[in-house]
Regions:
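Active-site-proximal region of nucleotide-activated glycan assembly enzymes
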Residues: 97-197
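Active-site and donor-binding regions of nucleotide-sugar-utilizing enzymes
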Residues: 15, 35-131
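N-terminal subdomain of nucleotide-sugar transferases
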Residues: 1-36
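Short, flexible coil/linker elements and helix-boundary hinge sites characteristic
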Residues: 27, 70-73, 172
């Protein structure tokens, strides 16, 4: 069966695009819906669709998109965002597998992928004895660092994503971020905190 995978908002990095390239090489069809200019920065062109409508238009849009593209799987970061909640509800009604990612329960160096959600929605057991039983017979994890990250690069990507999404909001007039505070205030507050640490 052909896997048609829809990528919604993910980490503010090229990570989702790299996953899609790998899955495409294995024969999957990968799609993306960009909700803001920051999304477009990390994935444009091939099989990407720009949603420029309002939040009120999103449920009907995503419902039609899932059916039109015969989506079999959805990959997204954080299931509590407005756009993601509606996509998940419609996916569950259609038997579409939803995989949620976040920055990992074990930090640094790990990223977590879970079916059906994370945290309170996680299917991962909470009892230590069940976790230990699941781990029996598994090899020791390879803790060798395979990828090197850069704080400066992460800051650059984050600022580029949020500031350009703010400045170029006119290109995606209906977009509403899940962030509680405007990025300018977040960056100013973070900068002041870092200065105080010196």
């Amino acid at each position: 069966m052909q896997r048609n995978i829809l990528f919604l908002q993910g980490p503010i990095t090229p990570f989702f695009k790299l996953i899609a390239d790998n899955l495409s090489a294995q024969g999957c069809a990968c799609f993306r819906i960009n909700l803001c200019f920051g999304d477009w920065l990390f994935w444009r062109g091939r099989e990407s669709t720009e949603f420029r409508g309002s939040q009120q238009q999103w449920p009907a849009f995503i419902e039609q998109y899932l059916d039109q593209h015969q989506i079999t799987d959805i990959l997204l970061l954080g299931e509590q965002r407005f756009y993601h909640r509606h996509a998940i509800r419609l996916a569950n009604a259609r038997g579409i597998q939803v995989v949620t990612t976040d920055f990992g329960y074990l930090r640094p160096d790990w990223i977590t992928f879970e079916r059906n959600g994370m945290s309170a929605n996680s299917d991962f057991p909470r009892e230590p004895e069940k976790i230990i039983a699941m781990a029996e017979g598994l090899p020791e994890p390879n803790l060798q660092q395979r990828f090197k990250d850069s704080f400066v690069r992460q800051v650059f990507w984050d600022m580029q994503y949020h500031l350009l999404s703010t400045v170029l909001h006119v290109l995606y007039p209906g977009y509403r971020s899940h962030q509680l505070h405007h990025p300018i205030w977040v960056y100013l507050g973070t900068g002041l905190r870092l200065l105080k640490l010196r």
